Amino acid sequence: RCMRLLLIEQPVARDFREVSTALKLITDIERIGDQAADIAEIVSNLKDEAYIKRLTHTVRMGRLAVRMVHDGVASFINGDEALADETIARDDEMDALFLTVKNELVELIKKDSSNADQAIMFMMIAKYLERIGDHAVNVCEWTKYSETGVHIKY
């Protein structure tokens, strides 16, 4: 339907960029949803278990992921390049948190391998959150393209 509209209406470059950006965003938003569903499934499977460690950094990652997705979508809706840039910059914090979680879990497994199953589940949650952050960055990259006509991969 979008492609037909493009052919019939023959939009100017700015309109075409906005429509093509929206089509690109759909893929990232869908992947964010898939990863959120995967996290929910893991958490559901762990709900009756005693956790091997406090998930302080993972909780921070979750909050950061929500903020990045929200701000990424808001940057597109409002054509806000500054918000897109701020959101892209937050990915460094997300990556650092993931590295911290990964290192903590590796050490936990080294100390007691009986914790490995749950540690792997926690690692998967952290990786999904990190990927959600990456998809939020993609949304921002496409927002900047929509506004400027230049696509820069961060």
Residue ranges and their predicted role:
Residues 1-154:
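Cytosolic, long alpha-helical scaffolding segments
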